[in-house]
Swiss-Prot record:
Functional note: Plays a role in hair follicle differentiation.
Protein name, as recorded: Forkhead box protein Q1
GO MF annotations in UniProt: DNA-binding transcription factor activity, RNA polymerase II-specific; DNA-binding transcription repressor activity, RNA polymerase II-specific; RNA polymerase II cis-regulatory region sequence-specific DNA binding; sequence-specific double-stranded DNA binding
PROSITE patterns: FORK_HEAD_1, FORK_HEAD_2, FORK_HEAD_3
CDD domains per UniProt: FH_FOXQ1-like
Gly residues bias: start-end ranges: 96-107
Subcellular locations according to the entry: Nucleus
Tissue: Expressed predominantly in the stomach, trachea, bladder and salivary gland.
Location of the DNA-binding region in this protein: 119-214
Keyword Zinc (UniProt): no
InterPro entries attached to this UniProt entry: FH_FOXQ1 (IPR047518), Fork_head_dom (IPR001766), FOX_domain-containing (IPR050211), TF_fork_head_CS_1 (IPR018122), TF_fork_head_CS_2 (IPR030456), WH-like_DNA-bd_sf (IPR036388), WH_DNA-bd_sf (IPR036390)
GO aspect biological process, one term: hair follicle morphogenesis
Length: 403
């Protein structure tokens, strides 16, 4: 490896002094000359670059010749060797520096260990309630609550101060604490009092301070299948199977019996998916035509109707209303239903078709088939309104509204 050391050139004013010193001290041994050619070598392994004495660059023949001659080269080589030694010492110090620094920091960390005191085994709600209950007046400010906690528990005396925010948040976010204003004109002040809410005593039941009401763990007893809910006494959690009840005159539907046989945890209602899928699907038209689903005309006795005046004159086409709109059905079914009406049934509010206005099938606006229209006994006001032009309160004809 070739090591080259660069030193600054000597000033021109110091040149003569160095020459004189070199000339006068030529008899003194030089550290380079003492080493000899064997230490540095003559092949230029460690050549000292020094400025020339005559103001220009002068090549040297060898380190041994310069030291033996006692010229200025020997004097300038001494600072170069010293600079090389300083550089080597700095490198050694830099190599040993990180390890020494780490050891020093480790010693400092070991000398001051971090110890955190144990936290008390209570929630912040319990600690605040404890402080308020131990007070003389039953109310404390935020600063007084903090002082109480610091005086009673060592955990709150350490360097950790985040517990103060927890105390403040628990005071303002829980319903079990109530703020009592010291000055009503300053509700935003921090010196207000805090006390326990008398309506939230359930949170402090059994000596345990809870955030919410404790849920009831026991469940209501399930009534036996043969007993009604109001007749079932208090039974254990798993009641034994009761004997089958005698058949009652009012028979229960099979759907209701299946619901009772289903487990108690299963949702049983008419809107449940099981009960919806259990019922067979029937279209609306089939439900309307099924026997027993529609009320036949004259099936039930009706009170006698009051006598009506004579038949009104034939109404125009606007007063004709479709019988299908009132549940009369299509004309084909009307004759079959009239045959079923007993002779004692009261007459309908339908006027017989006069000869001047025979029944004619008209095509309704909604249905595509033909409907049977006949004049009804409408009040005089409604007939008058249907005869004249539609006013501001009746913008459309009657058959358009009722069709």
């Amino acid at each position: 490896m070739k090591l080259e050391v660069f030193v600054p050139r000597a000033a021109h004013g110091d040149k003569q002094g160095s020459d004189l010193e070199g000339a006068g001290g030529s008899d003194a041994p030089s550290p380079l000359s003492a080493a000899g050619d064997d230490s540095l070598g003559s092949d230029g392994d460690c050549a000292a670059n020094s400025p020339a004495a005559g103001g220009g660059a002068r090549d040297t023949q060898g380190d041994g010749e310069q030291s033996a001659g006692g010229g200025p080269g020997a004097e300038e080589a001494i600072p170069a060797a010293a600079a090389a030694a300083v550089v080597a010492e700095g490198a050694e110090a830099g190599a040993a520096g990180p390890g020494a620094g780490g050891a020093g920091s480790g010693e400092g960390a070991r000398s001051k260990p971090y110890t955190r005191r144990p936290k008390p085994p209570y929630s912040y709600i319990a600690l605040i309630a404890m402080a308020i209950r131990d007070s003389a007046g039953g109310r404390l400010t935020l600063a007084e609550i903090n002082e109480y906690l610091m005086g009673k528990f060592p955990f709150f005396r350490g360097s950790y101060t985040g517990w103060r925010n927890s105390v403040r948040h628990n005071l303002s976010l829980n319903d079990c604490f109530v703020k009592v204003l010291r000055d009503p004109s300053r509700p935003w002040g921090k010196d207000n009092y805090w006390m326990l809410n008398p309506n939230s005593e359930y949170t402090f039941a059994d000596g345990v301070f809870r955030r919410r009401r404790k849920r009831l763990s026991h469940r209501a007893p399930v009534p036996a299948p043969g007993l009604r809910p109001e007749e079932a006494p208090g039974l254990p959690a798993a009641p034994p199977p009761a004997p089958a009840a005698p058949a009652s005159p009012r028979m229960r539907s099979p759907a209701r019996q299946e619901e009772r046989a289903s487990p108690a945890g299963k949702f049983s209602s008419s809107f449940a998916i099981d009960s919806i899928l259990r019922k067979p699907f029937r279209s609306r038209r089939l439900r309307d035509t099924a026997p027993g689903t529609t009320l036949q005309w004259g099936a039930a006795p009706c009170p006698p109707l009051p006598a009506f005046p004579a038949l009104l004159p034939a109404a125009p086409c606007r007063a004709l209303l479709p019988l299908c709109a009132y549940g009369a059905g299509e004309p084909a079914r009307l004759g079959a239903r009239e045959a079923e009406v007993p002779p004692t049934a009261p007459p309908l509010l339908l006027a017989p078709l006069p000869a001047a206005a025979p029944a004619k099938p008209l095509r309704g606006p909604a249905a595509g088939g033909a409907h049977l229209y006949c004049p009804l006994r409408l009040p005089a006001a409604l007939q008058a309104a249907s005869v004249r032009r539609p006013g501001p309160h009746l913008p459309y004809p009657v058959e358009t509204l009722l069709a």
